[in-house]
Structures are given as C-alpha cells and as structure tokens.
Amino acid sequence: PYVIKYNAKDPVAAERYAEIARRLGLEGTCQKALINSLCEKIDEFNVRLNIPKTLKDFGIQEDEFKEKVAKIAELAVGDACTGSNPRAIDPANMEKLLTCTYYGTEVDF
C-alpha cells in the first residue's frame, strides 16, 4: 500500500489504481476513495496472510534501519525495475518512502 500511495500522486497511475478497485468491486465515490479502499483491501489480505504491516514489524532494528536506509534507497533507485515505476523517484524520496514503510506512517509526498 505504501508504494501505491506514492504512485497515486501520478494522475495516470491513480486512475489505474481506481480502475483496479472498481473491478474488484470496492467502494468509493471518487478516485481517492477508491485508492484508499484498494489499500485497505491489501492491508486486509496482508493480515490474513500474516504479512507484517511495517519493516519494523519484520524485526528490523531501528538503529540498523537508520544506519542503512540511505544506501538501500540509493541502490533501490539504481535498480533496473525502478525505472518502470509509474512515478519517478530519487534517492531522497526513496529514503522517505522506506521510512514510511519502516514506521507505518502515511505517504504524503
């Protein structure tokens, strides 16, 4: 859900996510509500499958995360798969996104 919320700032990606939500029969009267429903549904699946909600819940220690997050962000941005992401990302924003996934905070950038 964190990456969906990041990518949903891109209008084309947002419409695609809304369309996925519609096809899944999820509720929402506007694009933002549909995207939120999609993220909530993914969260529900993750709970059912015992997938931790955050990187912290995986057992990664905070000091280790803070020590390595900048390098991980740099490597992630350089990965070939990142180029196919619908919304461009630089190392600074990747670090912010990873921080959201570690602490479970809202992606608002």
Task: Give the ranges of each region predicted by the language model.
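Gly/Pro-rich interdomain helix-loop hinge
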Residues: 1-67, 107
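Short, amphipathic C-terminal "tail helix"
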Residues: 64-109
